[in-house]
Amino acid sequence: MADDGLLLNFAIPDTTVLRPEKTKVKGGTWRDRLSAKKIAAHRTNNPRKEKSASNGEQNSNPRNPNRIQVSGPRPVKRQRIEDDDGNGGSQPRQQQQQHPGAPRQFVSSLFSKNPRPRNAVEEKNEAGAEVEDAKPTNAPLIDGLDTFTNLGLSAPLAAHLLTKLEVKAPTAIQKASITQLLKEESDAFIQAETGSGKTMAYLLPLVQRIMTISLNQKKREEGEQVQRDSGLFAIVLAPTRELCKQIAVVLEGLLRCAHWIVAGTVIGGEKKKSEKARLRKGLNILVATPGRLADHLENTQALDVSNVRWLVLDEGDRLMELGFEKELAGIIQKLDARQRPSRIPGIPAKRTTILCSATLKMTVQKLGEISLKDAVHIQADPADEDGEPRKKDEDDAFRVPAQLKQSYAIVASKLRLVTLTAFMKRTFMRKGSVMKAIIFVSCADSVDFHFEVFTRKNGDEEEKKEESEDSDEEDAEEKRKKLGASAHGTIAPATAFSNPSNPVALHRLHGSLPQHVRTATLGAFARNREPSVLICTDVASRGLDLPNVDLVVEYDPAFSAEDHLHRIGRTARLGRDGRALIFLMPGCEEGYVDILKKGYRDGGKALTRNSADDILKRGFGGNVESQNVDWEEKATEWQLDVERWALENKNYLEMARRAYQSHIRAYATHIANERSMFNIKELHLGHLAKSFALRDRPSKINVPGLRQAQADTKKDFKADRKPVAGKKRKAGGHDDDDDDVPRQTDTLTAAQKMRAKMKEHMAGASEFNLA
């Protein structure tokens, strides 16, 4: 009987078995003892978790249920299991042992855990409604009575427009401005929608007035007319170098009928020595950026502005946004102080200032107060545009051309890169469907990254190239020339969305490129007659008239509604059709659709919505129903291929990280009125990193330094060449004392650190390089 009682005592449940653990906890602080007791109690209440040991130990040493286990003074911590793939808890530790010190990478799925759009059903029904094609609002006038000769232009100039420039009729804004500027000498404010011909609207009256002065002088004094040394009569100011170049090209085309009138440019990025030589020879019309003109007015004695009678401020709102208010005020003050009565007959007694802007914002009104006096507001006649009366509220509004077809796509942040690729694949699938397209992104680093992604070569292509490198070298050079490959690295074949029947050339443009590279790239894109794409920042969003642009893609939304309207204004110009697509993310960004609708006179009835899944199906799956099954696999395979490409090369990986960080900084610079729709706190940084081909956690994405501006690079170069103060150089060019080299290096390092610190306080605004 006693033995039976002992057996019953040993068969008592586990609570009595683990009781001795309470008495065995000794040593340490009271916090350690308390935590050890809690762990022991937790293990007692959850006996199943005791089986988390390896399978090998369980099979070799079966546990004895009658054995009493006594824990040590400190209980052993349980291993944290982070197993997303279901392959066991030992896999993460094995990966860490294989790659010691490397940041942990995570390969997530493209089509899992993506947020859904908020208003999917309502917008889909609205997009399904049929809308009639709108009548173009910025096309040349059809009425035969509205010719250039009837507006007051001379017969030679009108004939030159018709025969050489193939401009048959004026637009509505050209009709209103030419009539006003030729009739009166008062200041004027020209306001018109994008793509309506504002450049010709103020250039034609200027050229006509100077031609009239020259003709009158020739009649009075035989054999003499206006020459390049007669004086500077007109100055045109533009915010960007590209716009100045374009204005100069248009002006040069107009002056072919009056070769005695000479025009020139002074812009940033060019050699001041060459500009001073042109100014010494003499110019009649000068196109300039505000900063460079202010510099020449201060330092160049050959620049005589005493005869300037016309001053044009093109894109006035952009001039103020880029911070040229101080320079403009100084230029106007110097022009007023240096103005003198002219000896040439026919020149007006006072200066006429013309301000051109698409909007009447507060900054434009402030610029008008600085430069204009009793100005006349010139707008296109509503009857000339669409025959409908304009409401009072719409007088000052900046509208989109009616023939422009705007659409938007709600795309999750993880799917942005593959969706853009699929859309471009579908766009250039057939030859001749789209000739030219522009992709707008937020910052220069993002331009460089996407350019490398879209022009990279696949593995199969690289193998074929290595095999036939020697035999087909000449053929490859011919193909590069056909596609316009550039020695500057800004033009390359777009392998991501090209096909054998329709090759596409990709161009990149941003403000960090040298000026001659920017000019060459923009000229190559404009002259290219083959399908081509330009990926750029807002440096190409204002005033540029690029021919045959059929499509504008806003991959990153603009920083303001006005910038958005200027971006999409690169297409649908002078009555031509055009399309525009903007990428928005699910959530708060969907509220931006209401702003898109405000840009249309009809309230955005023609605004359509594209589904991200439909874009991916058409780009990676095709039209056949059987092919639509594996479009997700093809999209995933393409994304993983890009990620592997970035991981294999440190330069590409650093480029992706720079683009990711610059994109986040640019995202935080939206104007205050739209910041609720572009809230940086709502961004899923991990999903966003996926769209930049990154597998690292957002907290582990670090970049050694920011992009250096051009000015900083020049300063560093000059500082390296300067000798140390107080030391003489030998004949060979070396310093007498070798100890000066570390001292100079320390000075340069301190200067670089100071510049980096200043850039951090400036919130990274310098890397956008818009001007």
From Swiss-Prot:
Additional remark text: Present with 1460 molecules/cell in log phase SD medium.
Record's subcellular location: Nucleus, Nucleolus
Domain remarks in the Swiss-Prot or TrEMBL record: The Q motif is unique to and characteristic of the DEAD box family of RNA helicases and controls ATP binding and hydrolysis.
Protein name (database record): ATP-dependent RNA helicase dbp7
Domain Helicase C-terminal as annotated: residue spans: 403-615
Domain Helicase ATP-binding residues, every copy: 179-378
Region (Disordered): 23-139, 458-485, 703-771
Motif position, Q motif: 146-175
InterPro entries registered for this protein in UniProt: DEAD/DEAH_box_helicase_dom, Helicase_ATP-bd, Helicase_C-like, P-loop_NTPase, SPB4-like_CTE
Biased composition (Low complexity): 90-105
Assigned EC number: 3.6.4.13
Alphabetical keyword list: ATP-binding, Helicase, Hydrolase, Nucleotide-binding, Nucleus, Ribosome biogenesis, RNA-binding, rRNA processing
GO molecular function, one term: ATP hydrolysis activity
Annotated source species: Aspergillus niger (strain ATCC MYA-4892 / CBS 513.88 / FGSC A1513)
Binding-site residues for ATP, renumbered to this chain: A192, E193, T194, G195, S196, G197, K198, T199
